[in-house]
């Protein structure tokens, strides 16, 4: 009986034992039923400086006392280790901010045996608002070899474990500003945040055209030889006839030689790569213009290879290894035809930014992502068969072909399949027949409309309104009269056509309309139909039968209906590019002999290409 009563009513000794009494309310692992972080906008992509609102939800199984709940905002960069890479696993913290959302105040100094706070059994919600930092923020991404992550981490533990850690930062600061953390929390919950660093492509400067110049080595050797002969003859003439061949004051024989050499034109091969803008968005097309000046005629069906490349650089720090990985996103193979008269060629094409391309990431401590447009030009004049890796594997294994049923299956990874057929340009870069031009492209997040862009749009709207008014006025019969060939509407259309830059130079260009309306000539079958009313029924049947018979070819002496009028000009088709002319931009010279950082050697690694830096001491590839 006493034992049963003691279970219901505590004895005075047990009630006075404070240590045992507080242990009943102590936080343990089984004391919490659920503990998680809930955001108000869980699927939103956040920007730097925005405020994130949400709640920390705690569901306890029993009454709790002396607990602390903290919330941390952590941003970090992590590099994963792999068997085929020399990189070691590394984690770099960008920022780590911790706040206490529930617990005793720091100013209160209470004994551990006393109650500082307590929560009853059930569900408790703790709202919070966290502001994202504006600096040291990069686009969150998980690329397999590493990741850039931002998380909200909530932790719950006893108040005794909320202490100041021993670190050099806390040793130098005062006791009020020292950072406290919750060591060995009983429960934690993390929420991943998607963050994008905005890049406005309209604010980026215009890129400079990339120019590559090649000179004939035989011409340069002849120049050196002629210069030596000229200087020797000048010295001899000065010693023999000093008064007759005297040079002006301040001039030397070498200066005169330089002037004579500059006047001699040196045959060179020039290739210029132009891109109108520095930054583009996903899904937009990148216009590419190539201008080539050669020394002879060239015809190559696969002479130009244009590739849109993404390069990832991983850095282990000052004492670590730097590795680069390359991935081809888009590729074009264009023919190269050089004019046999002018030895010039102009190629206009475009590459589309894929939808799965993420923004450019630069300035990050361990990782960076850059985009390049790489152009390979075969100026040797010798055609080379271009085979992709998939074609090479198909030739090696001719039996490994798809069945007829597999051809009609929908492929959810069609983009990767198309990219697997791209040509590996590594072997062509090492060849002396190909020249390389590379320019960097920024992939941004948005494009703001500036005043410079709004002005052409207003002009375009005004021109459309004027053209619509002109088209309405053309419906009057007075416009078609031959008495006024020089009308203002005609000058307006002519000016609009001349303002459009043409892709190919056209000589004696004429607009596709005539000043004089040609006279109407009715066809012969119309006159026959009009005269059938005077014929009998038999003659009508004969004409109907003759119309069903095959027609005879026209005589050579009869003029064609196109050339019926001698003064009439035929309708001519013309092509043009509907783009605005850009002002001249200073050229940026690139030497072909200099190594290009974006195109070193690489190996195939997981659909990405590992770029191995070249070593001067050894030519072996790792």
Curated annotation (Swiss-Prot):
Residues 227-240, 451-476 have a biased composition (Low complexity). It comes from the Eukaryota. Residues 477-486, 560-582 have a biased composition (Polar residues). GO terms for biological process: cellular response to pH; filamentous growth; filamentous growth of a population of unicellular organisms; filamentous growth of a population of unicellular organisms in response to biotic stimulus; filamentous growth of a population of unicellular organisms in response to pH; filamentous growth of a population of unicellular organisms in response to starvation; positive regulation of filamentous growth of a population of unicellular organisms; symbiont entry into host. GO terms for molecular function: protein-macromolecule adaptor activity; ubiquitin protein ligase binding. Induction: Induced at acidic pH. Residues 210-261, 445-489, 529-622 are annotated as: Disordered. GO terms for cellular component: cytoplasm; cytosol; plasma membrane. Gene3D superfamilies: 2.60.40.640. InterPro entries: Arrestin-like_C (IPR014752), Arrestin-like_N (IPR011021), Arrestin_C-like (IPR011022), Arrestin_domain-protein (IPR050357), Ig_E-set (IPR014756). Residues 535-545 have a biased composition (Basic and acidic residues). Pfam families: Arrestin_C, Arrestin_N. Required for the proteolytic cleavage of the transcription factor RIM101 in response to alkaline ambient pH. Required for hyphal development. Belongs to the arrestin family. PalF/RIM8 subfamily. This is pH-response regulator protein palF/RIM8. It comes from Candida albicans (strain SC5314 / ATCC MYA-2876) (Yeast).
